[in-house]
Amino acid sequence: MTKADIVARLSDKTGLEKGDVQAIIDGFMREVRVSLETGENVFLRGFGSFILKKRAQKTGRNISLNTTLVIPAHYVPSFKPAKVFAETVKEGNPIKE
């Protein structure tokens, strides 16, 4: 499912214009991104959490130059589903292939 599919589905269910739904979804995604950029996790009860995970410093290799380089510690965004959400998905229909 793509963002366009979500916009169309929500527009049908709510009666809102697709442009309005698109603006709401874009605004939500922007707020999640800005919150994570400033180090603030986003918690949505019953759905899940957008959190930052710290990756430790490590040594990597450039195999084409046969050199080693240090990859500094950094944060990566992650989504952790709520228990209710994960259980609902687990008990749902199998994935379409």
Regions found by a protein language model. Give the residues of each.
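Strongly charged
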Residues: 1-97
